[in-house]
C-alpha cells in the first residue's frame, strides 16, 4: 500500500505556510523560513513536503509493526481534529491538559484508568448504582467525566506508546520531555516560534490554523492505516477476508480520501490565507 498522497497546493490552501510575527521567531527555524510578508514569517513549504513525507514513513513503519501511536494536542483548535483522526485509525490521543507523568509514571496513570473502567462498569450495570444516594451518584458521575476527559483517549493503550505525534511543541513541552526520557520518537509540527531540535521528525508548518491542523492529523491517520494494511498483507491475509475491525478501518480510510479530494479542490486559497491571517492577528497566534 502507498503512503497518503498530499501536495504543496493542499498545504498552501490549508494555510500551512503562515508563521508568527517576525519578532517572535525562534532563530533555530531560520533554515525553514522562506521570507516575510506584513511582518509575518512565511514557511518554506518546499522543505515541509519532504520532511512531512519522512514523518509519514516513520508512522507507517511503526503501525506496520503493531506499534502504538499517541496523538498529542491540547490547544483548543487541535482537540477535535486530533481525537477524530486518532479514533479513525484506532490509535490513542490526549487532547485535554497533559497530566505530568503520563508516560514516565505509567503505573499511576494505569491505576487511574482502572478506576475509570470501574466507574464505567458501575454506570453500565443496572444495579451498579443501587443503594447510593443522589449526591453520591452525582459525585461518581463527575469523577467519571473528569477521568474520561483526561484519560479517555488512552484508556485502551495498554502501555507507553511507540511513537508520539505532537501539535505545538511549545505547549506540549512536558509531553515531549517525557517521551525523550523514555526514548520514544517524536513527530511534531514546528511553527516559526518553535525549536525543531527538540523533536526527531520536525514538520515545519502553521500549528495554529484549524484547517492546517486537520490536514496534518488526517495524513498521520492515513499513514497509520497504510501501515496496518501492510502488516495484514505481510501476514498473508486477504483484506477482503479480514475480520470486521480491519474492514472498518479500510472503509473509513476510503471514505475520508473520497471526501477530502473534492473539498481540497473547492476551498479557495484566499479563504485559507484569510483564516490563517486572522489566526495570526489574534495576539499573534497566542499559544493557548
UniProtKB/Swiss-Prot annotation:
Stretches assigned to coiled coil: none
Alphabetical keyword list: Ribonucleoprotein, Ribosomal protein
Molecular-function annotations in GO: structural constituent of ribosome
Domain of life from the UniProt record: Bacteria
GO biological process: translation
GO cellular component: cytosolic small ribosomal subunit
Listed HAMAP family: Ribosomal_uS2_B
UniProt record similarity statement: Belongs to the universal ribosomal protein uS2 family.
UniProt name for this protein: Small ribosomal subunit protein uS2
Native source species: Maricaulis maris (strain MCS10)
High-level lineage: Bacteria, Pseudomonadati, Pseudomonadota, Alphaproteobacteria, Maricaulales
Amino acid at each position: 500500500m502507498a503512503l497518503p498522497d498530499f501536495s504543496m497546493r493542499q498545504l498552501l490552501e490549508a494555510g500551512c505556510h503562515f508563521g508568527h510575527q517576525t519578532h517572535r521567531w525562534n532563530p533555530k527555524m531560520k533554515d525553514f523560513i522562506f521570507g516575510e510578508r506584513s511582518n509575518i514569517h512565511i514557511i518554506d513549504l518546499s522543505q515541509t513536503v519532504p520532511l512531512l513525507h519522512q514523518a509519514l514513513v516513520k508512522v507507517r513503519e511503526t503501525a506496520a509493526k503493531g506499534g502504538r501511536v499517541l496523538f498529542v494536542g491540547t490547544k483548543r483548535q487541535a482537540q477535535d481534529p486530533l481525537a477524530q483522526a486518532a479514533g479513525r485509525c484506532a490509535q490513542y490521543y490526549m487532547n485535554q491538559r497533559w497530566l505530568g507523568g503520563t508516560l514516565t509514571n505509567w503505573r499511576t496513570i494505569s491505576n487511574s484508568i482502572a478506576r475509570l473502567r470501574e466507574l464505567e462498569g458501575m454506570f453500565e450495570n443496572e444495579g451498579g448504582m443501587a443503594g447510593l444516594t443522589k449526591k453520591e451518584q452525582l459525585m461518581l458521575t463527575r469523577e467519571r467525566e473528569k477521568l474520561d476527559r483526561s484519560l479517555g483517549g488512552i484508556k485502551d493503550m495498554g502501555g507507553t506508546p511507540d511513537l508520539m505525534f505532537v501539535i505545538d511543541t511549545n505547549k506540549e513541552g512536558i509531553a515531549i520531555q517525557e517521551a525523550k526520557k523514555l526514548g520514544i520518537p517524536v513527530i511534531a509540527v514546528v511553527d516559526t516560534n518553535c525549536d525543531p531540535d527538540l523533536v526527531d521528525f520536525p514538520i515545519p508548518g502553521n500549528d495554529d490554523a484549524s484547517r492546517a491542523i486537520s490536514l496534518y492529523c488526517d495524513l498521520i491517520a492515513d499513514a497509520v492505516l497504510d501501515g496496518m494494511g501492510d502488516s495484514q498483507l505481510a501476514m498473508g491475509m486477504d483484506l477482503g477476508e479480514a475480520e470486521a475491525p480491519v474492514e472498518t478501518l479500510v472503509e473509513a480510510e476510503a471514505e475520508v480520501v473520497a471526501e477530502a479530494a473534492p473539498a481540497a479542490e473547492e476551498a479557495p486559497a484566499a479563504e485559507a490565507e484569510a483564516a490563517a491571517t486572522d489566526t495570526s492577528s489574534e495576539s499573534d497566534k497566542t499559544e493557548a
